[in-house]
């Protein structure tokens, strides 16, 4: 007997500016990720229900097509677009459920545009939502629980249109983060517990994705010997992105997963906290496991800012040693920085650019501090009337939405772009990527040229207008 609910849309909204989408959506090995959370929801949906995953960054919402229920999950800067999609689908008779970090922070706002909302994680309540829809008893609010990752199925990769995304694959091995930085909403959404996925499950999924590595053709061996050992892996697309917020939060589990990566013979990159560099045996195992890069949230060069934001693992006077320890093992460093903290002055922009270039970081994102709903910094700034914009489209880390302490909004806007221009200038790329000693230039040079293209949009006054100074 067919399921009474026949067709579902799972929608990942985009920013309502095509140019802003392009700025952060280039199809490169480090960008352009599919909506893995929606692919998990699809895997939890009964097989006799037709599921369509729509990534609005790359395709249009199929308005007018038959659909019973739509789930829309986006970040804060996606919400204006998400609400427009929800409103239109509801006029077509579609029941709409909204979820994600922003909806968790402001569920009543989201209910103005949806029939129901999911607060926190959705996997544990998705079956209830489907049952209630069929019964005609859909609730307004569903409160998600912290699910055990061992109880989850493998995501529906068949729903991804591969031409839209980076050439590798994506996987989740842990969920949550124990640090609780004031600018981050991860703990507000996932809770304070840190959950791990069994290493055996991870091994099986990787083998299902890639299979065992076949014997190498002579031409691949020649490329590996004469150009770079990574090249055959890129040709075979044996590249994995580990999406965890902090891969090493549970060291014993991280070691078990690294042994899996080593056995499966892949190349991979992911996110880790700064204190990774204090564990030399972990660094050695990461190198042996095929790690080509680690994204580290350095955030700031000011220890005062670090302490104020409660990012306690970070010690700014150890940053250079951390980078060198990774570079010595052939692991690239992808740094993330934010500007606009209370200890930042107009000198911070050149300080970050100097640090990135001198320490030869393979990539560096410099973002404007954004008081995202659900974070402690949002609550602090809101209580002190420092937030001057609640136009959610501007909560994209490229727009100033609050009053900085030691500079004007205009100085913050222009300074962030100055940092990008220096880091991704041809001179900056040469010094960081091509000047010896260098790490995996075959991989990072095209990535940097892509970021240079992205920089032109990020620095465009047409795409991100320069704000007026505010009193």
Located regions from the model:
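Flexible glycine/acidic-rich beta-alpha junction loops that bind and position SAM and/or redox cofactors
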Residues: 15-20, 108-109, 252, 304-309, ...
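Alpha-helical structural signal in soluble globular domains
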Residues: 44, 48, 88, 92, ...
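Structural recognition of alpha->loop->beta junctions
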Residues: 109-128, 285-295, 351-366
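Radical SAM [4Fe-4S] cluster-binding motif and immediate context
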Residues: 154-334, 341, 347-350, 354
């Amino acid at each position: 007997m067919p399921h009474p609910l026949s067709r579902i849309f799972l929608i990942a909204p985009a920013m309502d500016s095509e140019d802003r989408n392009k700025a952060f959506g280039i199809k490169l090995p480090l960008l352009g990720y599919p909506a893995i959370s929606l692919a998990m929801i699809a895997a939890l949906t009964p097989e006799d229900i037709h599921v369509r995953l729509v990534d609005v960054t790359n395709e249009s919402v199929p308005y007018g097509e038959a659909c019973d229920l739509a789930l829309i999950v986006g970040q804060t800067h996606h919400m204006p677009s998400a609400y427009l999609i929800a409103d239109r689908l509801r006029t077509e008779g579609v029941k709409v459920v909204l979820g994600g970090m922003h909806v968790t922070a402001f569920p009543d706002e989201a209910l103005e545009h949806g029939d129901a909302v999911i607060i926190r994680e959705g996997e544990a309540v998705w079956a209830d939502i489907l049952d209630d829809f069929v019964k005609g008893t859909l609730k307004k609010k569903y409160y998600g629980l912290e699910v055990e990752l061992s109880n989850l199925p493998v995501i529906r990769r068949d729903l991804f249109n591969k031409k839209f995304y980076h050439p590798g694959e994506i996987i989740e091995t842990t969920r949550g983060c124990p640090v609780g930085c004031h600018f981050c909403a991860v703990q507000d959404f996932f809770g304070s517990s840190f959950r791990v996925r069994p290493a055996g499950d991870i091994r099986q999924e990787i083998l299902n994705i890639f299979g065992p590595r076949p014997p190498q053709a002579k031409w691949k061996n020649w490329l590996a010997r004469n150009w770079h050992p990574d090249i055959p892996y890129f040709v075979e697309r044996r590249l994995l992105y580990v999406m965890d917020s902090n891969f090493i939060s549970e060291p014993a589990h991280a070691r078990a997963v690294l042994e899996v990566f080593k056995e499966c013979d892949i190349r991979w990159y992911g996110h880790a906290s700064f204190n990774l560099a204090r564990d030399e045996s972990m660094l050695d195992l990461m190198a042996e496991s095929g790690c080509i890069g680690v994204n580290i949230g350095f955030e700031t060069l000011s220890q005062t800012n670090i302490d104020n934001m409660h990012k306690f693992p970070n010690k700014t006077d150890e940053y250079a040693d951390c980078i060198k320890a990774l570079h010595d093992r052939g692991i690239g460093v992808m740094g993330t920085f934010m500007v606009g903290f209370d200890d930042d002055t107009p000198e911070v922009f050149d300080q970050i650019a100097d640090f990135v270039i001198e320490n030869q970081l393979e990539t560096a994102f410099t973002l404007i501090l954004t008081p995202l709903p659900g974070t402690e910094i949002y609550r602090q700034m809101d209580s002190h009337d420092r937030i001057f914009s609640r136009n959610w489209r501007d909560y994209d880390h490229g727009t100033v939405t609050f009053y900085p302490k030691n500079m004007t909004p205009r100085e913050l806007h222009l300074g962030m772009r100055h940092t990008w221009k220096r880091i991704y200038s041809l001179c900056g790329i040469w010094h960081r990527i091509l000047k010896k000693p260098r790490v995996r230039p075959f991989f990072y040079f095209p990535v940097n040229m892509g970021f240079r293209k992205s920089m032109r949009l990020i620095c465009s006054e047409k795409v991100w207008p320069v704000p007026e100074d505010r009193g």
